Amino acid sequence: MRADWTFLLVCLLLPVVRSTLSKTDAKKASKVQEAESSVAERPAQDRGLVVTDPQWRDIVREEKRFCHQCINTRQFKGAVLGYITPWNSHGYDIAKLFGPKLTSVSPVWLQLRRRGPESFHITGLHDHDPGWVKAVRKANKKNKILPRLLFDGWSYQDYVSVLDSEDEMEELGREALEVAKAEGFDGYTLELWSQLGGNKRKELVHLVTHLCETLNAGKLTCVLVIPPSVAPGTGQPGMFGRDDFEKLAPVVDAFSLMTYDYSGPGRPGPSAPLPWVRECVLQLAPENQWRHKILLGVNMYGLDFSSHGGAEPLLGARCIELLKEVKPKLQWDENTGEHFFNYKRNNGVKHVVYYPTLKFLQLRISLAAELGTGISMWELGQGLDYFYDLL
């Protein structure tokens, strides 16, 4: 949903070269725990799995065992938006299977391009799968399909031209509305705020207001992706603040708040420290009036940091492989509310891994319930199947 996500995709598509394990680790890996395939009769939280001291064996054995009979029962009562990406097919399956636990799904399909003065075109429609959309709606008829609409390939001058012209905004809104109606979408998840690096915020407020009012007039939903209100690692104000939020809250249906990616390459650490996540919400909405429109972002992926300064995105399947290989002792950081583990390759390179666990998710879902927000998950196919018991 920003440059880091592009980095995530690139990292996933590039061939990854991994050093071999040390001889000791190789011997340990000779006997691996396999995942149980049977359906669980009770959700993960009732099976003693949501703990601060999980064993790697339990994660490997249980991660595919979700409670099938609990799929139609929602534990979290707020709004739940789940992102899916075309390059991760498992997310499509998750959206269908756990549809009753979601309130909206945002496929990462679409790009809004400016072709010239008062001329716009939405690309990516080839990814639209009507059969899948029908299946998601069958699983939960109330689920809204809100494709992400990324303002892509725009120059700074493109933004200036649109932000300074009511006619440009009118044409942009018309194009978005017509495509949504023609394709049967319920609205959009708009991603444009971060592209200007925090500049021209007053003008962006006007553009988003115009676009959301156009969509709302057509009985469509308008969600806005927003960066964290507290900059990661610095404590300084982010690119989207309380003033922006209060101006847009009356017209934007929901705000997808990116409360993750706190750490990154060269700066190893937690993905979403709990105190920081809380502060990002409170900075936007110290009072409760509009908090229900905030979708607290929850990452379903992790990062594998190396002592050389690199950081490899880590998805569920690879994390399970790694747990089998290194058989680590998971450590709990009480201050951040995250698990991590360490391992070392035979070339001497040390690694530290942060990946979501059931306890990680429980704390963030509980925080959302406490603050009265919804949640947004990036992205559905990257997590472990038993995660969804908590929803």
Swiss-Prot record:
InterPro entries membership: Chitinase_II/V-like_cat (IPR011583), Chitinase_insertion_sf (IPR029070), Glyco_hydro18_cat (IPR001223), Glycoside_hydrolase_SF (IPR017853)
Residues making up the signal peptide according to the UniProt record: 1-19
Keywords, alphabetical: Lysosome, Secreted, Signal
Compartments, as annotated in UniProt: Secreted; Lysosome
One Gene Ontology biological process: carbohydrate metabolic process
SUPFAM superfamilies according to UniProt: (Trans)glycosidases
Listed GO MF terms: chitin binding; oligosaccharide binding
The keyword Signal is annotated on this UniProt entry: yes
The keyword DNA repair is annotated on this UniProt entry: no
Region entry Disordered, spans: 27-46
GO cellular component, one term: extracellular region
Superkingdom of this protein's organism: Eukaryota
Name of protein: Chitinase domain-containing protein 1
Record lineage: Eukaryota, Metazoa, Chordata, Craniata, Vertebrata
